């Protein structure tokens, strides 16, 4: 099947007005979304690789995918390796896509791509590199993978257009009209005639609306354009439903609906209108697509295209700092989510102890049942990763519902990464447990070293404004001490009933390109790991909120403070995830006294928070199980 698809694509490449020597197929959709709808799953369709990150390149004789360390094992399982080559992104011996194209194509070659699926930040350096190599990059007006699908009788599904969900102020904490007012103030500072918002979560955040067009992400396909006097929502056929319109009006947000497909023509007309001004510009996010940049600059309608303001979106920076209502929502939904996860683990241990066969899929489905019992639950925040035994070493493992199912065994390390979308927040938690409470010495050592790294980040104090990459090595030190590591970042931002992965801040060995620095009110993940391919995987993941710290704060390191970084201010983290780590998998001999107390204090907080709720709900078996799991750990 993959060969047939490649052949169809190659025929289309050869039939272009200027034959294409290579065609680039990114993962992203027209909004640079991490998670995409089936209509946009072009790289998956052509390659068979389902990972959420990666770029495919097809030439007349080669087919390659560049992806990062989270997906190496997954790619080798899913792709036809007789047709596709894995390019292990960021490894020293792996050339970048630009370098590979420059060295493997002939001088004068033309490379094509759909400008809707590449950001301006991706397009420009690629164009520069190819020009330097005396090659051309062209914007192909129609997507060739979509055309290949039609030719093979497998057309892309329709783009979803589901109902809009108004999110009341009791959850958002700030009305849409106030957000638009603040954005207009930012626009005035930039002398911007318009702000073009293309990221789906940014549109949803600004308008206090949610949707369900992309699985796990409560967003809707749309664009938002704000001018000094008007706001335009490009969505569906342009008709804003009555319930959504009423909330917008109640929140002093006057929004005019336009058809989703009209955005390019609208921006071209806007460019024509602004062409004679010379004093103002149009502001786009640097993550907006090349197609949107072309339209806003008027490249196809003006002799001299407009200069654009292209930088990080002000909406991204606004929603990064959660307000008090959003932060309290995060804390409360993590309590409810903790109840669901605790109930699940007690159930799973009970089933396996009784000799029942439980597959990874069955476990995932049961966890969803428990989450559905909790107030304001709207669905999972991503596809649950239930990695039993060697599957836990596949960082973004996804079991198939078709074919043989993996049974969770009592001698397995079981890595469970899952999360929920609630109206008052988003959760993302990973816990790793040995299903018979008897891990090997190697597993205990790895488990404990990963936990030590998580504690080092979770208990860290640092100056306000420090970027996340500074903290990344904290999480790795205990692993590095014995020559171990993990091939992913340590933390990502999390949206408020929005995308579980939210920029522009994060904690990774590689700096986030637009990281504004750590500030109070951010919510991030703290998730070091270790993966022994073919045997087991370990990851501990909590969500933390960034908080201001003084000597009087209830923080385990506050009492040691003697300064405030020369007036810069002190920050730390408060862990909001509420699920214990498995005591039996901890090698106490590897812990210092601070770490041991940190774990016991955390478990005490978890039990004192969740225990009374379980008792009130008459979930006595769950309460008793939690009490045992949170019992103090002592040195023998």
Model-derived features: where do they sit?
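Active-site neighborhoods and metal-handling regions in enzymes and metal-associated proteins
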Residues: 1-636
